[in-house]
Amino acid sequence: MEHYISLLVKSIFIENMALSFFLGMCTFLAVSKKVKTSFGLGVAVVVVLTIAVPVNNLVYTYLLKENALVAGVDLTFLSFITFIGVIAALVQILEMILDRFFPPLYNALGIFLPLITVNCAIFGGVSFMVQRDYNFAESVVYGFGSGIGWMLAIVALAGIREKMKYSDVPPGLRGLGITFITVGLMALGFMSFSGVQL
């Protein structure tokens, strides 16, 4: 149990997808103007990562890995396209659920909801799972923790950006300029966790 708690804390803080690996930056910067919208997208990313990483773990382990289906056959060259297909299917299902049950959130996310399909954080989570050879339980914990970490980062950035509306930002830095500086400072803050040994 201690191993899984360690993996969860590590994936949220020490190896944060947004602030340590800078994955998923396009939606991270574009949707982080309001806390409510950022929280909605963060929840969507948590759901997709929590499901996509373990599902792709099963696909990789039982279909693509060497000797998985047939002895002597290695289908790992199909990994990327298979992972993207699974992620795309999960995002489509999530999009239909949000459209049906949460129309305001669906409309607020707009084009960024389908873009979760090609969000680097989602694909990065799946790729790290394969690279680190996580088992199914570890991949569930890692997917959930990575999603929570990404959501934490985007909601924190949105809160800071909402407060900065009332700040006296120099004209040359207004908009994305000050946002990049803010993200850099947040990343420095998260770097302080890098020395933590779990």
UniProtKB/Swiss-Prot annotation:
It catalyses: a ubiquinone + n Na(+)(in) + NADH + H(+) = a ubiquinol + n Na(+)(out) + NAD(+). The chain crosses the membrane at residues 11-31, 39-59, 77-97, 110-130, 140-160, 176-196. Its main location: membrane. Its EC number is 7.2.1.1. It is found in: Cell inner membrane. One of its GO terms (biological process) is sodium ion transport. Keywords: Cell inner membrane, Cell membrane, Ion transport, Membrane, NAD, Sodium, Sodium transport, Translocase, Transmembrane, Transmembrane helix, Transport, Ubiquinone. It is an enzyme of class 7 (translocase). It is a multi-pass membrane protein. GO terms for molecular function: oxidoreductase activity, acting on NAD(P)H, quinone or similar compound as acceptor. Signal peptide: none annotated. GO terms for cellular component: Gram-negative-bacterium-type cell wall; plasma membrane. The keyword Ubl conjugation does not apply. The keyword NAD applies. Belongs to the NqrDE/RnfAE family. Composed of six subunits; NqrA, NqrB, NqrC, NqrD, NqrE and NqrF. NQR complex catalyzes the reduction of ubiquinone-1 to ubiquinol by two successive reactions, coupled with the transport of Na(+) ions from the cytoplasm to the periplasm. NqrA to NqrE are probably involved in the second step, the conversion of ubisemiquinone to ubiquinol. This is Na(+)-translocating NADH-quinone reductase subunit E.
